[in-house]
């Protein structure tokens, strides 16, 4: 109901006919993906940085920390949701203070460090709850930085479509990292899951830094507006 009292912003891609509007949406998306900046962000969305994939596997390793079913449900359910909201708010604030892609990578590295710390921590139920909540808290930071990067990149034309395009692509690393984390667990146990999650995240940041440096070199020699 609240939306009824808000004025709808102008849609720059919209024309008098549907086909014209769709054509403009296609051009907007194409222009996003064919610029160096847009392609770099598209690539970033494909990387396993700060995706929080281990959250889907906590129940598989809870026994290693002697955590009860109730503790797992509480920590990985309501409490994780609450702390991730707080993380999103703080992470969004920080993302406005520094370069947003830098914030995204930085938060991803912090998440990897927390994952390693969990692997090294004592195997008790209390430690399980603490680190599950810490993981959710930092993942909130990562999701806020993700949103900041997307909103910074999409511009005004066909913003909803471009936002959903990048958001959809960002689900790819969540899927494949969950599979890779599961393989780490099957091969090396709980620590294998945690170290795999952390190592892949760090590798993703390193890969993005390398590609970003190359992109900046290309941008410095490209015509204005690219």
Task: Give short role names for the model-derived ranges.
Residues 1-13, 207-212:
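C-terminal membrane-cytosol helix-exit motif in multi-pass small-molecule transporters
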Residues 8-40:
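Juxtamembrane intracellular "pre-TM" segments in multi-pass secondary transporters
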Residues 36-74:
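Extracytoplasmic gate region of multi-pass secondary transporters
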Residues 87-100, 185-186:
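Helix-to-loop junctions at the C-terminal end of transmembrane segments
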Residues 109-123:
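C-terminal ends and interior cores of transmembrane alpha-helices
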Residues 126-142:
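Hydrophobic core of transmembrane alpha-helices in multi-pass small-molecule transporters
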Residues 141-155:
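Intracellular juxtamembrane helix-capping segments at the cytosolic ends
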Residues 157-187:
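A late C-terminal transmembrane helix in Major Facilitator Superfamily
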